[in-house]
């Protein structure tokens, strides 16, 4: 059994849904793992991880609109405003999604996800 770990950062243009699929598969390509279980973890309280369709950009736009409607910025319900009107909504969105994913990995470089999916 082999265990390996890897840490990376991504730059974003603010709130949104971003793919890290390429970064994860690039790292897997450097490993000598024929099969296993990949755990992806984000150590942040106002960000999260999703596995979602990546073929139709409307899916990501619809998800973004849904979360904006479900948890709007600046809602007077929120007391926590110290880091801006979007911070508490980000914490709530993170609580509604996931901070960790477990994905089967095979063939050295491929996640066992359909080709239209992305992390």
Give residue ranges: language-model regions.
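Single conserved hydrophobic/aromatic residue that forms the stacking wall/gate
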Residues: 110-119
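Active-site histidine-anchored catalytic micro-motif
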Residues: 1-111
């Amino acid at each position: 059994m082999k265990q390996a770990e890897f840490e990376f950062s991504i730059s974003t243009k603010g709130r949104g849904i971003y793919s890290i699929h390429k970064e994860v598969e690039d790292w897997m390509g450097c490993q000598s793992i024929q099969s296993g279980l990949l755990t992806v973890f984000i150590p942040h309280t106002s960000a999260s991880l999703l596995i979602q369709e990546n073929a139709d950009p409307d899916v990501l736009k619809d998800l973004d609109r849904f979360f904006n409607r479900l948890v709007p910025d600046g809602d007077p319900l929120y007391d926590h405003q110290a880091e801006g009107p979007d911070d508490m909504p980000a914490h709530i969105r993170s609580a509604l999604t996931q901070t960790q994913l477990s994905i089967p990995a095979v063939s050295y470089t491929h996640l066992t996800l359909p080709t239209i999916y992305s992390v």
